[in-house]
Amino acid sequence: MSNSPLVNYTKISPNKSSPRNHKIDTVTIHCVVGQCSVETLGNVFAPASRQASSNYGIGYDGRIGMYVEEKDRSWCSSNAANDNRAITIEVASDTKEPYAVNAKAYAALIDLLVDICKRNGIKELKWKADKSLIGQPDKQNMTVHRWFANKSCPGTYLYERHAQIASEVNKRLGSTNIKPCLLYTSPS
């Protein structure tokens, strides 16, 4: 199992379980709730008392940090089963709803997801916005933190773009099963 060659900064967190106990077949995108750098995020995950981490983080400038190697489980989604099967990615965002992500961070997220999928044999990203499909990567292999804890993570901005993210990644993966992008709209 390898790590992403796109990483610009590494600061391994003690907050992890080693090794992960499941094959990587899922991705979980989180919002940081701050327009921070990869170094700042590394410092957030450094103290053992924090009891939180992610595999990767993307700074406001589009740089990519690694905090937990892919062979290990991060402590990111408030759910051990999800974190054992998922690569978790924290993305710098605004500090309040909709927790918007800037263009540099978004572009780096797409690049990182394409790389993760290629290296881990994930042929396409699947998003149905359906919590009941957790753990069924043949139907949906993107999960969100809000499904496991009382949080708004990944925020409205990223949540409403999950179908678009999957479509952009799948196009670059050469997926033959690309569906039109259906954006999520909040109920009135």
Residue locations for each model-derived region?
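Long, well-ordered alpha-helical scaffolding segments within enzyme catalytic domains
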Residues: 50-52, 85-133
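Conserved small/polar residues in nucleotide/adenosyl-binding loops
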Residues: 184-188
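Residue-level detector of intrinsically disordered/flexible regions characterized by low predicted structural confidence
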Residues: 17-18, 179-181
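Low-complexity, Gly/Ser/Thr/Pro-rich intrinsically disordered linker/tail segments
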Residues: 170-180
